[in-house]
């Protein structure tokens, strides 16, 4: 498949490995985005609505959650990976491989997404929340029917940024045998001084990231109303 | 229905303290349309916002239907609020939703069936004249159109109580009048209670039963619209009344006074209720032989009766005028001679 | 976990084995897997990007064997973590070398020179021992396979040691006076170890011979034994020599010999 | 000074096209206060926003001082815009800046010395009555207070042209009147040109020289305020004029009509300018011996003259009334008998 | 200094090393935040103002910058590190060490900050920009006196998120001998199985991140006006 490339940049890896690693990346990013997105949005919403003066003001929850997120964001990814091994094994049956990597990736991206979401949600006009409150909306309705839709455009951009961050993080998940393009780039390209592999994997990553960003930009723009 | 009991609300910003509400007591009876008027910054919005707890009073309490909302549990509070529609001064529309969905929002909150929502929203949009904007987003609307969406949204659930904060401030007189008529209509048909903030005396005149005047966080005067208009006590109230019943001398009267003709006098008669001028006119014209002209007159139609002033221009020989002046002094309508010095233009 | 029940295998009734490797060791394993597959052993290669996880995963039964480490690192690791693992065969040796773009011999290295060493613990220990061998440093007596810069007894030339990731050493050589580089990496980076190195680990450095490790209970498992045999076959030896162009030297010694390095 | 030449502006949203401005031609002369009135959604904001290119017209051009802004280079355009103050319908204040800094912003843009800024802003804040709010942030202000900050900001640089989009919509009559007086004052003193959007006819009456009425993106009528008020041509214009000069029958008149007494007739006299009623009164009372009462009267004072209506209540034997009716038919004031059927309440 | 700790968690590293690595982290994060902050804000602002319909609409700039940022965000950090070696050497004289690490860190964080800033700036009310335009503000004034101050609260949260991201990235900069706490945590704690070191370094990281986040939250809240 790649034989037609000039020698200097012809990768030393098989196209099967490349395709497989592409699949692994998509698989890891997809699943961990799903979970960390849900968790991150939940945490982000909680961080916003429990803060002083907000609709579900709860000093205890806010002041517990806030540092927990900070702690998770403090730990270097590799150490997080290790610290989570027992939990990963309990959850996934195994602590190695592509599937197992989803757990630490979720722990990595969840709190990160929470922070981005928090920032987006704080920009919602307080008047909107007042209107919701005055209509007798329940707290859940205020969140799901007012705050989230109003912040949607910014949320989509935040999720885009987070997704691209996840793509980057999968490269590190190679430590537990997760594979993925980033890992191939590092182990075959970088460590083996194989410029061809480096080039093609980085190109693939660029295509992925470019695609994700375009998708994010377009969908965010489509729902932006100002 | 709505009762404010010694409500005080202070805001702190930096080392400044603003007393937006200062020991306010107010009672709005069921089915009443109660207007609150006052200068900009008087505390009107704060008052109406504390009715549904958007602002928690610093002290005092607000009762709706005899219930202090502040004592309710979350779910009960939501239920209570669903019975209170609110029109916001700054509209507070959802930017992310179409006009249709904005109006539908309160209905969706109560899980109204889709078909019912469609019917009700269509009806409301057609009433506020925005059927063709159903699929537009708020940012594509003009100021008045946004306000009308806010009105439609507040009415969507047929609330028992309606809180209107400057509901017609961005609207032309024609639209204002049709909105006010609608409010009056639902007030009569459904016995809905309306608390209405406004800075326009004409709004009060048009639909309110009672009115309170606010200044610096205090209610300085209140009463039936009729009594306030006919007999304002506080200078601020008078200013508002004057905004639709001018009390300054009309230009034509001032002009006439400037000519200082000896055989001409100008009298002002204040009209209250059903006063009759027929005997006054007859006496002046027939008995004294005075030439009587109506120089200027402004009357306001307030709930079926007329209030205002008439300026009569009397011309005759000075001695006849002097004679008539004695007659006029004892006349029950108490005509006052206008000399140009006594009053200052507003 | 155990492979016990799977002593019987044939091409029609294949047995599957998971082997953990790190980074770049896959070519020979792909080659071995092809050979083994014909005999009914399906090798699944699990690639790690780290030197801790493969042993952990082996002990936890997530893989059946691993092949990525030197015997000294292995011994140290199982002692530290109290793991019941055993070395079941030797594989290759990739000697370490000291390279410089500025100096032709170790003696030329001046006072206060900066030398890069690997930040990864076992390799760092090897780096320091090579520097001791070259006469640049003196290490503590109890210097072990994961000892680091804090175990330097004497640094007469006041050499500044900078810890970096191994793969960067060839790339950063010109920024320092000398760099310690793994053979594998050196060859990949286009260096010729016997010619370019100004100091080289002796080829018989037993502690740094790589091994295949398995759980002790599986030490005698015929499947694993067969895999060791395949690795140590001439066919594979030739393959490795060609593939790595001398950077990685197939080194097949007995287990006794393997375990008899000085500790 | 400001000239709109065949300006058209269309908005597209989805498959809908809205023509907000439809071939508008308008000329505002230097030093003029030009009012634009129209129903909500008529295109007023779009018109004023195209004056300083906040909306680029789809076709046609806008000239300010004879210059088409659209042809200017970036720097020249900025300079031109610094001469045009604008008051926004939705205020557009900087949330992140204090009241003081909001008003100071346009001055800072031109690098005005600090001391001058302080002086000017203090002066403006005191004028709009918000000196005590200098250090507050916009979100701590009431609706009317925000609007006043917007006004102060627009005036800060003493612009030559002022564009006001509903500059007083959130203000009480007293504040409105003081703002309008200020605008009139700077208009006279500095010969500043003002284009003023409003939906309140009273604003037009108070300070405008000329007025244009918009409907559905078109200017349907324009002229001097006097001519428009006294003689509105288009039904929409009439509606606006009627908003301050009610044309519907007053309640008291309607009530009187309902009684249908045979010896009572009600006549309506339209007052335009300096009309005199003295001979009418004398004839009716003295010649016919009719009992004449003034049932209701509303007159407006527009630039020195009075416009409006008087309702006379005539009581006498039917045959006398019949006789008088012939006399009245030929009277130059053209009194019209009101029967209750002819007119419908507005 | 650390001898009083119970043996199980007494780190095997000297307190000098710890202090030095702390200094290195602060040094790297400080400088790279400074540069990447400036660059990120510049890029973020450019991304916003050159997009279609905005004040400096420029299709060429926007459509060039957008993918360049994506490319930089695509490359795994370790590969970015390597790819930049010649540039770093040219700029810093050496491609090794704490100072040299600033270059790749800036390349890593700059585009990332750009994306966060972009999202924050897009939330500024268009009415504010209209008001600025109507006042005759120059493009630069619109950006610096209107858009940036109005977005300040959200910008501060974005910068906080980015700074914490930078702290995480410094752990990876160890690859070129940059040192820092994250690196000590990985090489001394994780690789040498020194729980004491792991604990103390991670604790230090937590303290740093917690401090940064609190600082960000507080300053953002102070300037938030809604
Ligand atoms: N961005 C937009 N997209 C689509 N339609 C728009 C947009 N802006 C304005 N319109 C439409 O153009 C018409 C004129 O709007 P404009 O704001 O000029 O009205 P207006 O006369 O100022 O009304 P108001 O008195 O209510 O402020 C309205 O029908 C409005 O819905
Ligand atoms: N959050 C706040 N912080 C500080 N002061 C406030 C706050 N909200 C309102 N105020 C002040 O309280 C006073 C009353 O404000 P309010 O909004 O009730 O006035 P209003 O009568 O509705 O005026 P308008 O007619 O202009 O809308 C004003 O002086 C205002 O500046
Ligand atoms: Mg208000
Ligand atoms: Mg408008």
From Swiss-Prot, chains B, D:
Q: What is its EC number?
A: 7.4.2.11
Instruction: Give the binding site residues for ATP.
Output: 38-45
Alphabetized, the UniProt keywords read:
Amino-acid transport, ATP-binding, Cell membrane, Membrane, Nucleotide-binding, Translocase, Transport
Positions of the ABC transporter domain = 2-241
Keyword field contains Cytoplasm: no
CDD domains in the record, alphabetically?
Answer: ABC_MetN_methionine_transporter (cd03258)
Q: Key word ATP-binding present in the record?
A: yes
User: What are the record's GO terms for cellular component?
Assistant: plasma membrane
Any one GO MF annotation of this record? ABC-type D-methionine transporter activity
The UniProt similarity line reads: Belongs to the ABC transporter superfamily. Methionine importer (TC 3.A.1.24) family.
Q: Please identify the protein, giving its name as recorded.
A: Methionine import ATP-binding protein MetN 1
Q: Which organism is it from?
A: Shouchella clausii (strain KSM-K16) (Alkalihalobacillus clausii)
Q: Give the gene name.
A: metN1
């Amino acid at each position: 498949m790649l034989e037609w490339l000039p020698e200097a940049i012809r990768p030393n890896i098989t196209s099967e490995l490349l395709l497989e690693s592409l699949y692994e990346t998509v698989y890891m990013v997809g699943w961990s985005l799903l979970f960390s997105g849900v968790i991150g949005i939940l945490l982000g919403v909680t961080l916003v609505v429990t803060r002083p003066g907000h609709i579900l003001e709860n000093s205890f929850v806010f002041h517990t959650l806030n540092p927990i997120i900070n702690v998770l964001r403090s730990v270097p990814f590799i150490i997080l990976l290790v610290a989570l091994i027992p939990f990963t094994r309990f959850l996934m049956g195994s602590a190695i491989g592509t599937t197992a990597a989803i757990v630490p990736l979720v722990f990595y991206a969840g709190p990160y997404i929470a922070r981005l979401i928090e920032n987006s949600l704080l920009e919602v006009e307080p008047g909107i929340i007042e209107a919701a409150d005055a209509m007798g909306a329940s707290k859940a309705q205020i969140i799901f029917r007012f705050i989230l839709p109003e912040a949607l455009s910014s949320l989509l951009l935040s999720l885009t940024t987070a997704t691209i961050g996840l793509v980057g993080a999968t490269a590190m998940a190679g430590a537990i045998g997760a594979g993925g393009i980033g890992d191939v780039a590092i182990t075959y390209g970088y460590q083996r001084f194989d410029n061809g592999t480096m080039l093609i994997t980085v190109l693939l990553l660029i295509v992925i990231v470019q695609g994700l960003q375009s998708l994010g930009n377009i969908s965010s723009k489509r729902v932006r109303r100002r | 229905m709505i009762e404010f009991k010694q409500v005080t609300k202070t805001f702190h910003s930096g080392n400044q303290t603003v007393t937006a509400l200062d020991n306010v007591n107010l009672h709005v009876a069921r089915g009443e349309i109660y207007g609150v008027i006052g200068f900009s910054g008087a505390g009107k919005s704060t008052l109406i916002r504390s009715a549904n707890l958007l602002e928690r009073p610093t002290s005092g309490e607000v009762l709706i239907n005899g219930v202090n909302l502040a004592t309710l549990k979350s779910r009960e509070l939501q239920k209570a609020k669903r019975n209170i529609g609110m029109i916001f001064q700054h509209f507070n529309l959802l930017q992310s939703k179409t006009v249709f969905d904005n109006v539908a929002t309160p209905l969706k909150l109560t899980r109204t069936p889709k078909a019912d929502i469609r019917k009700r929203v269509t009806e409301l949009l057609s009433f506020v004249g925005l059927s063709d904007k159903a699929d537009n987003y708020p940012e594509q609307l003009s100021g008045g159109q946004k306000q009308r969406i806010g009105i439609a949204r507040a009415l969507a659930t047929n609330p028992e109580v309606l809180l209107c904060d400057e509901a017609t401030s961005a609207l032309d007189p024609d639209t204002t009048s049709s909105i006010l008529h609608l409010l009056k209509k639902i007030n009569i048909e459904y016995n809905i209670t309306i608390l209405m903030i406004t800075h326009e005396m004409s709004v009060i005149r048009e639909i309110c039963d009672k009115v309170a005047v606010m200044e610096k966080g205090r209610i300085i005067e209140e009463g039936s619209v009729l009594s306030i208009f006919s007999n304002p006590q506080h200078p601020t109230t008078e200013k508002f009344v004057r905004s639709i019943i001018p009390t300054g001398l009309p230009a034509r009267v001032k002009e006439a006074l400037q000519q200082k003709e000896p055989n001409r006098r100008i009298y002002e008669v204040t009209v209250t209720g059903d006063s009759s001028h027929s005997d006054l006119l007859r006496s002046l014209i027939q008995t004294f032989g005075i030439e009587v002209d109506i120089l200027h007159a402004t009357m306001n139609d307030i709930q079926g009766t007329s209030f205002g002033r008439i300026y009569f221009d009397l011309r005759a020989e000075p001695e006849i005028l002097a004679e008539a002046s004695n007659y006029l002094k004892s006349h029950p309508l108490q005509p006052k001679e206008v000399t140009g010095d006594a009053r200052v233009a507003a | 976990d155990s492979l016990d029940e799977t002593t019987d295998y044939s091409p029609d009734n294949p047995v599957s084995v998971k082997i953990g490797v790190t980074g770049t060791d896959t070519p020979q394993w792909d080659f071995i897997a092809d050979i083994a597959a014909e005999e009914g052993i399906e090798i699944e290669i699990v690639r790690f990007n780290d030197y801790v996880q493969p042993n952990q995963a082996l002990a936890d039964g997530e893989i059946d064997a691993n092949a990525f480490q030197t015997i000294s690192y292995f011994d140290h690791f199982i002692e530290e973590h109290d793991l019941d693992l055993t070395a079941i065969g030797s594989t290759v040796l990739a000697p370490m070398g000291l390279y410089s773009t500025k100096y032709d011999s170790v003696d030329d290295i001046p006072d206060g020179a900066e030398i890069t060493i690997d930040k990864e613990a076992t390799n760092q220990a090897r780096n320091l021992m090579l520097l001791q061998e070259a006469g640049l440093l003196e290490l503590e007596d109890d210097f072990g396979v994961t000892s680091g810069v804090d175990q330097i007894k004497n640094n007469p030339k006041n050499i500044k040691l900078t810890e970096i990731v191994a793969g960067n050493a060839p790339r950063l050589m010109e920024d320092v006076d000398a760099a310690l580089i793994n053979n594998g990496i050196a060859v990949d980076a286009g260096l010729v170890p016997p010619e370019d190195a100004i100091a080289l680990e002796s080829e018989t450095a037993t502690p740094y011979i790589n091994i295949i490790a398995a759980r002790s209970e599986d030490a005698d498992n015929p499947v694993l034994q067969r895999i060791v045999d395949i690795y140590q076959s001439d066919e594979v030896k030739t393959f490795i020599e060609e593939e790595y162009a001398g950077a990685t030297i197939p080194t097949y010694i007995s287990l006794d010999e393997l375990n008899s390095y000085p500790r």
